[in-house]
Amino acid sequence: MNEQLQLIKSSIKSIPNHPKEGIIFRDITSLIEVPEAFQATVDLIVGNYKNQGITKVVGTESRGFIFGAPVALALGLPFVLVRKPRKLPRETISQSYQLEYGEDTLEMHVDSVKAGDNVLIIDDLLATGGTVDATIKLIKRLGGDVKHAAFVINLPELGGEERLRSLGVEPFTLVNFEGH
């Protein structure tokens, strides 16, 4: 593991039994409190997607905003928000998806993505891939194309990478953590 990735991984705190017993929460707020680690995170994602023909960057609520906005800015691209219901002011489309215990919904503005857009999705963590799957569906319903998704953290045993590849999306992750 190179020096930048070591810095990133060591800056992420692991909180046992949060938000419930048996879960190890990977806290990226500790990463963004270390400017060198935050910068390295953005730089590595930007470096992977320069000259890839990306036309828009989409970040999912809420931690995807933290990393997606600076990546979009560094690439000179528009940044699009995907949010929980009733948080966006203009006309939206919505997509429901399954959680471990229930269902949730994401929304985006109907005019945020257009036919022909080549979209990069960014979020902080890839677990099962449910959130990013719903985000992909929103983008495709608006005519956009998604071939890439970037994450700071991957929990490989939860199968998110395989799920994305089955959807034709190549995941890019910076650090893996075992256990969840």
UniProtKB/Swiss-Prot annotation:
Origin superkingdom: Bacteria
Predominant place of localization: cytoplasm
Pathway: Purine metabolism; AMP biosynthesis via salvage pathway; AMP from adenine: step 1/1
Entry keywords, A to Z: Cytoplasm, Glycosyltransferase, Purine salvage, Transferase
Annotated GO MF terms: adenine phosphoribosyltransferase activity
Gene Ontology biological-process entries: adenine salvage; AMP salvage; purine ribonucleoside salvage
InterPro entries reported in the protein's UniProt record: Ade_phspho_trans (IPR005764), Adenine_PRTase (IPR050120), PRibTrfase_dom (IPR000836), PRTase-like (IPR029057)
Uppermost EC category: transferase
Reactions the enzyme catalyzes: AMP + diphosphate = 5-phospho-alpha-D-ribose 1-diphosphate + adenine
Subcellular location, record wording: Cytoplasm
Keyword Cytoplasm: yes
EC number: 2.4.2.7
GO cellular component, as recorded: cytosol
Family: Belongs to the purine/pyrimidine phosphoribosyltransferase family.
Subunit structure comment from the entry: Homodimer.
Free-text function comment from the UniProt entry: Catalyzes a salvage reaction resulting in the formation of AMP, that is energically less costly than de novo synthesis.
UniProt name for this protein: Adenine phosphoribosyltransferase
Native source species: Mannheimia succiniciproducens (strain KCTC 0769BP / MBEL55E)
Lineage: Bacteria, Pseudomonadati, Pseudomonadota, Gammaproteobacteria, Pasteurellales
